[in-house]
């Protein structure tokens, strides 16, 4: 397990606490034990804290402080799970795949199509599973959204927006170590980039194509007003249907909002279809409470019980029920199926079946990574004094081409086809 921060604590840790001593069942294989062998963090301090609290329940995994390759004990592992800051994903995943280890990467998988191409090629060459986790695809609301689209009940999305706001304590405290030179679009907007691309594209059968990406943003709180660390980002993504119609989506993200707003995060979306409108607001679908001296700072007024709360079951066992945990269990089960679900001569056929899962395989992440790479390129140009850029997709000049106002020279971000 590489990366031991909030994502590990809220998603991976609950899984390992349940699977270390209790196997889960895979029909083609039988009982599967998923054990945490190694903890990797830059200093090892976070690993010590985890072991002091959960070491015995986790089977006392080894703790390693390593700020650069190689990963100690890699040869003893079957898979590497990566939940580090996004600009460290590629090198960790590459090292694991070179060692013929399966990888599961937190969103976004990587920051450029060049990196995605390299990881995909390594996974194919070495017969490994290479997957990316987008937990919001497992949100019950989003499962319902996809079901209505897949079944043709809501048809042909035309436009929409999403706003995703996080408090200043995220950027100034929790993530302050790594946000220098980063932006909330790549970290937060990517949830909805993938949701839109997968739900309205692959799931609907429409076979639309990514056409244009635009972005702008603001600076001055998380970093200098003329620097490369962004407070908020406004992203626009445009697609084209085969019949020439287009769809456009605006995704606004910020991680410098007041700490005192009612929820842990504030997320609102609207999607407008040919025959329907979908509206969703994360804070308005659940519980509201007030506790003197605790809300809204220590405990939020609209707690997110379905994701990150610790709950006491009727039988007095504490657990976290968060959505998306099944993705991790499924990854372990699919590794077991790949390696033990039949005769060795049929392994390639099993691998082909597993790689066809567009929602999680790296091969299904092309549009998402393309949008991230385009956004990063636009914001980089903005920080360098050239705002207002637009990236065109799969045009005559290349797969991703950055066009800046008043500049006749086009910058090719990615030559191949997206």
Q: Predicted regions span which residues?
A:
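C-terminal helix-rich "cap/oligomerization" subdomain common to oxidoreductases
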Residues: 79-81, 330-418
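Short helix/strand-capping hinge loops at secondary-structure junctions
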Residues: 100-102, 106-108
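NAD(P)-dinucleotide binding in Rossmann-like oxidoreductases
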Residues: 243-329
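A contiguous active-site-proximal alpha/beta segment in oxidoreductase catalytic domains
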Residues: 110-173, 182, 192
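A short helix->loop->beta-strand "cap" motif at the edges of active sites that frequently abuts
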Residues: 99-101, 126-128, 245-248
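Redox-cofactor binding/interface segments in oxidoreductases and associated redox assembly factors
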Residues: 81-82, 105, 162
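N-terminal glycine-/serine-/threonine-rich beta1-alpha1-beta2 phosphate-ribose binding loop
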Residues: 1-99, 117, 121-125, 351, ...
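Rossmann-like dinucleotide-binding domain that binds NAD(P)(H)
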Residues: 172-266
